[in-house]
């Protein structure tokens, strides 16, 4: 498994950088952990967007999720033009109506996760736990 830091800025990204976004790659599958501001642009330095399979959102502060809509709409365009063949899957907590709008069948799907769920996402086994966030 390989982890590529796409962005690690907090709050607001700097020029040519991105907020929280970490790309996990294993066995030809790609999972993006968070996609804060600037992530959709910076991700393309590591991976063509049509090769991204999954996006896992840890929470809904903008520095962790603001580019999710761009990735969702981008996949719709990519599939309609034939640039991508597979839908993009989003995973996140069900507490935000914004998350539900990421589903645009058959292009994107949003699957909710619970605080203590265990989920197999491609080759990645993900276990979730509720934690305290310092700015909540």
Residue ranges and their predicted role:
Residues 1, 29, 53, 88, ...:
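Nucleotide donor/acceptor-binding cores
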Residues 1-47, 136:
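Conserved beta-strand hairpin/beta-sheet module of binuclear metal-dependent hydrolase folds
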Residues 8-11, 77-78, 131:
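Short beta-turn/strand-loop junction motif enriched in small, turn-promoting residues
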Residues 14, 23, 80-82, 116-118:
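Short secondary-structure boundary/capping segments
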Residues 26-29, 76, 95-96:
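Short loop segments at secondary-structure junctions
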Residues 37-87:
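Active-site metal-binding motif and surrounding structural segment of the metallo-beta-lactamase
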Residues 83-136:
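Metallo-beta-lactamase
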């Amino acid at each position: 498994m390989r982890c590529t830091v796409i962005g690690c800025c907090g709050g607001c990204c700097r020029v040519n950088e991105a907020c929280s976004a970490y790309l996990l790659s294993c066995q030809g599958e790609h999972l993006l952990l968070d996609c804060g501001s600037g992530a959709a642009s910076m991700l393309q330095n590591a991976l063509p967007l049509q090769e991204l399979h999954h996006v896992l959102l840890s929470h809904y502060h903008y520095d962790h999720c603001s580019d999710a809509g761009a990735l969702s709409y981008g996949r719709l365009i990519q599939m309609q033009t034939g640039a991508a063949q597979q839908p993009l899957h989003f995973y996140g907590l069900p507490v935000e109506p914004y998350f539900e709008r990421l589903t645009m069948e058959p292009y994107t799907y949003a699957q909710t996760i619970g605080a203590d769920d265990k989920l197999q996402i491609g080759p990645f086994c993900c276990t979730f736990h509720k934690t305290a966030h310092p700015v909540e």
